[in-house]
């Protein structure tokens, strides 16, 4: 089974849909990013505190190494962490309203 994720960012909300075999779509999560504590690239030192605290972990990334077009970022909330793959354009759109919570390194 081939699984892909699609992200929609609007009004400080991130909607995540799962697409199975390029035909079935299901909404899996809606994140209120005003409650987000931090968003940083996977492996960033900014995430050390969150990685050591445990909590629930959800992987909504594409599952492949980063490319020039897609980068893997972790979104941290109190007690929950989400892994997503985003383009620079998508990240820049989020940074317009949430720049103080998004780290680029």
Model regions: which residues?
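Transmembrane alpha-helices and immediately adjacent membrane-cytoplasm interface residues
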Residues: 1-2, 19
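Short, surface-exposed charged micro-motifs
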Residues: 4-6
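Membrane-cytosol interface motif
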Residues: 8-25
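A short, polar/proline- and glycine-enriched secondary-structure boundary/capping micro-motif
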Residues: 18, 25-30, 94-97
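Short amphipathic beta-strand/extended segments with alternating polar/hydrophobic composition
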Residues: 26-34, 82-88
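Structured surface patches comprising rigid loops and adjacent beta-strands/short helices at the edges
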Residues: 28-49
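Short, surface-exposed secondary-structure junctions/capping segments
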Residues: 42-50, 98-105
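A membrane-cytosol interface segment of integral membrane proteins
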Residues: 55-105
